[in-house]
Design a protein with these regions (language model features):
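Short internal beta-strands
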Residues: 1-3, 23, 137-138, 157-166
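Phosphate-binding loop of NTP-binding sites
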Residues: 1-3, 7-16, 76, 199-202
């Protein structure tokens, strides 16, 4: 169970067998599980704390993916899979298609496909995964979702945003309702994805990340 997620952690009283947990912070003395400290992933089992691997060995972007690795490692520990096997698997895993998938580097900019992020919360997690200047492509089908929180993050964190598809008008409205930030330089509206990609290519500079 995730120690740092209230919905998950509230289920601990329902556990019939051995409880293992994961989270960014070290577990309490009476708990076993994985955690992150000083750039390293650890597994605590009783009085033993074992180093799994350094954070820099994880190829996946974003803190949410660190949580995913911590969860995978604690499941592996429950199955008594050796630490060296955990380490090897994580180091070789570069992600799945359409989920913060690195597409290519082009003229010094890096292009990522996160098109599986069809909800604003997932798009926000993707934005938080990068420190580089961002060009963000937002759009697709209109699922009547709330865009306000993402719009606020875009103004704070994104350099250029390009909207397209059915949901473009709602995204534009949400962006217009937010107090402008200092980071966002431009907002463009394109009819379709291909046009949006072309617009992003014109804006891209070396060191930028283009995120769909």
């Amino acid at each position: 169970l995730n120690r740092e997620d209230p919905g998950s952690w509230n289920l601990r009283s329902e556990v019939k067998g051995r409880l293992l947990s994961f989270g960014m912070q070290p577990p309490a003395s009476d708990l076993d599980g994985t955690f992150c400290q000083n750039g390293q992933l650890y597994l605590k089992l009783g009085s033993n704390t074992l180093a799994i691997m350094p954070l820099e060995s994880i190829k996946l972007r974003g803190e949410h993916n660190i949580h995913n690795v911590l969860a995978a490692c604690v499941i592996a520990a429950a199955l008594e899979i050796p630490l060296e096997v955990m380490r090897s698997c994580v180091e070789r895993f570069s992600g799945v298609p359409h989920r913060l998938e690195f597409v290519r580097e082009w003229r010094g900019s890096q292009w990522y496909n996160d098109s599986i992020a069809t909800a604003p919360e997932r798009a926000m997690a993707a934005v938080h995964s990068f420190q580089e200047p961002l060009i963000l492509l937002l759009g697709g089908r209109d699922k009547n979702l709330p865009w306000q929180d993402l719009a606020e993050l875009v103004h704070r964190r994104v350099k250029h945003v390009i909207v397209f598809g059915e949901s473009a008008s709602k995204i534009l409205a949400a962006l217009g309702d937010v107090q402008p930030g200092e980071t966002l330089q431009s907002i463009q509206h394109c009819g379709a994805l291909q046009e949006a990609v072309q617009a992003a290519a014109k804006l891209a500079r070396g060191g930028d990340v283009i995120l769909l």
